């Protein structure tokens, strides 16, 4: 699913459809800071969900973090393979 999601993100980056939240992140006036702020916000929400032991919210916020992380990778001209390689090196 990560590869599929990343392909959609790359498509939005290339085509910048007007009605796409993902595309709006690539054209945001704050640039990558908009994504970095979202990552911080979503991480805080994940911490709060974990403290509340709210499994549904933990899954939701984790997905938000993964999504925004993939957008950041695309902004930096990286991809899922870079992430996989780093994780493999840590085995």
Predicted regions span which residues?
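Flexible "arm" and connector segments at domain edges
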Residues: 1-62, 66-91
């Amino acid at each position: 699913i990560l590869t599929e999601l990343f392909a959609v993100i790359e498509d939005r980056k290339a085509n910048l459809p007007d009605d796409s939240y993902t595309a709006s992140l690539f054209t945001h006036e704050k640039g990558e800071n908009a994504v970095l702020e979202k990552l911080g916000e979503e991480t805080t929400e994940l911490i709060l969900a974990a403290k509340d032991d709210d499994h549904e919210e933990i899954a939701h916020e984790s997905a938000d973090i993964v999504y925004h992380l993939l957008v950041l990778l695309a902004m930096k001209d990286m991809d899922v393979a870079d992430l996989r390689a780093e994780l493999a090196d840590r085995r």
